[in-house]
UniProtKB/Swiss-Prot annotation:
ATP binds at residues 156-163. Produces ATP from ADP in the presence of a proton gradient across the membrane. The catalytic sites are hosted primarily by the beta subunits. It is a peripheral membrane protein. This is ATP synthase subunit beta. It is an enzyme of class 7 (translocase). It holds the Pfam family ATP-synt_ab_N. GO terms for cellular component: plasma membrane; proton-transporting ATP synthase complex. Its EC number is 7.1.2.2.
């Protein structure tokens, strides 16, 4: 094993010089021991990012560099960072290096470990079949359906409900689907990760889930690589066991943000809005590995933070290009008390075609969107002149659009403690029939408020009865 020594420390970036001819390869993991006094030491892992010349390398630290001194001895492990894979990881919580961070015993030394850097599957190995993944969430299943083995993005600014939606999807899909899930917490709140772990333990889903965290308080190196650690675990289940795996990533923006934090320290010239010039390449390397092959599939659901609600920001804009379906969360809808605050006109899916979802579903979805679009166009007239100035046809459109808008909201299982209402799972067939009935005017006599935060149309009629309306 080659041994070098530290020549410079710049926050999370450390330069190391090796003997001539012993330079470690890019992406290799290096280790060094930090003295903590009283004979205690902690191990720090570095990843080689650049070759500087003069037998020196520039590395990114995976944990805090406090206490690192120039001249400290560094050892090349001769291989990239590797994480445990296989059934032993299920029900467990790991960090970016594959070290356990739960209260369970250490993993057996015989557990297989795979490197986190690898090539994406070859073009001819990719699967092309398109099949719908039912989520039980009306607005998603009707207007922007998810694809099994596809990539799905949940876009939204701060506090519009991305994490709650991802938790509901874990609850619905992981329990209904019964397969294996991997959750990668990338640069998000530790509290949310803790809550999620306990919720999954209570529901029993944890037994089929591996969790990897590199949270907000950790250095950029960990946040930059933890998505790859989670993906490596998912790839094993796909490639070696032929499973259909669910990969949840919360939040993909933090992966980009971590790259941008170290980019300047690595000596790269900043690009648009100060992001790293390698933004598209880094995103591509991650996203191209999240795919379905002829052996098994990885369905990924990724939360994407939108800085200042600006969708033209390079980070969310780069992620858009890789996705099969997008669910856009809109702040205006949260202000109206519509949860999940999914924008029915901005959300998209390449599966919303008659060939995939069927003629009836497609027609109902397009009619719902057309009604909501017409309502949006009429809102300016209503704001200036009031409802009375509209034609009878337009009044009917507005009345139905408002019912549709409220009916697109839904009570979530994971939000029971906030709403006091039981969560609901609505099958796709029922969703299509319910919206078809609203479009046909069968429920024009039911008050708008009865449509808020409910599951199926039966729950609407129940609420209406409670309001004293003849159903």
């Amino acid at each position: 094993m080659a041994v070098g020594h530290v020549i410079q420390v710049m926050g999370p970036v450390i330069d190391v010089r090796f003997e001539h001819g012993q330079l470690p390869a890019l992406n290799n993991a290096l280790t060094l021991d930090i003295e903590r006094g009283e004979g205690n030491t902690t191990k720090l892992t570095l990843e080689v990012a650049l070759h500087l010349g003069d037998d020196a390398v520039r590395t990114i630290a995976m944990s805090s560099t406090d206490g690192v001194q120039r001249g400290a001895q560094v050892t090349d492990t001769g291989a990239p960072i590797s994480v445990p894979v296989g059934d032993a990881t299920l029900g467990r919580v790991f960090n970016v290096l594959g070290e356990k961070i739960d209260l369970e015993p250490e993993l057996d030394g015989t557990v297989r470990r795979d490197p986190i850097h690898r090539q994406a599957p070859k073009f001819e190995e990719l699967s092309t079949k398109v099949e719908i993944l039912e989520t039980g969430i009306k607005v998603v299943d009707l207007l922007a359906p998810y694809i099994k083995g596809g990539k799905i993005g949940l876009f939204g600014g701060a506090g519009v409900g991305k994490t709650v939606l991802i938790q509901e999807l874990i609850n619905n899909i992981a329990q209904e689907h019964g397969g294996i899930s991997v959750f990668a917490g990338v640069g998000e709140r530790t509290r949310e990760g803790n809550d999620l772990f306990h919720e999954m333990s209570d529901s029993g889903v944890i037994k089929k889930t591996a969790m990897v965290f590199g949270q907000m308080n950790e250095p950029p190196g960990a946040r930059m690589r933890v998505a790859l650690s989670g993906l490596t675990m998912a790839e094993y289940f796909r490639d070696e066991q032929g499973q259909d795996v669910l990969l949840f990533i919360d939040n993909i923006f933090r992966f980009t943000q971590a790259g941008s934090e170290v980019s300047a320290l690595l000596g790269r010239m900043p690009s648009a809005v100060g992001y790293q010039p390698t933004l598209a390449t880094e995103m591509g390397q991650l996203q191209e590995r999240i795919t379905s092959t002829n052996v098994g599939s990885v369905t990924s659901i990724q939360a994407v933070f939108v800085p200042a609600d600006d969708y033209t920001d390079p980070a969310p804009a780069t992620a858009f290009a890789h996705l099969d379906a997008t669910t856009n969360l809109e702040r205006k809808l949260t202000e109206m008390g519509i949860y999940p605050a999914v924008d029915p006109l901005a959300s998209t899916s390449r599966a919303l075609t008659p060939a995939v979802v069927g003629e009836e579903h497609y027609e109902v979805a397009r009619q719902v969107q057309a009604t909501l679009q017409k309502y949006r166009e009429l809102q300016d007239i209503i704001a200036i002149l009031g409802m009375d100035e509209l034609s009878d046809e337009d009044k009917k459109t507005v009345s139905r659009a408002r019912r549709i808008q409220f009916f697109l909201s839904q009570n979530f299982h994971v939000a029971e403690q906030f709403t006091g209402q039981k969560g609901s799972y609505v099958p796709v067939k029922q969703t299509v029939q319910d919206f078809k009935a609203i479009l046909e005017g069968k429920y024009d006599h039911i008050p708008e408020d009865a449509f808020r935060l409910v599951g199926g149309i039966e729950a609407v009629l129940e609420q209406a009865k409670g309001m004293g309306v003849e159903v």
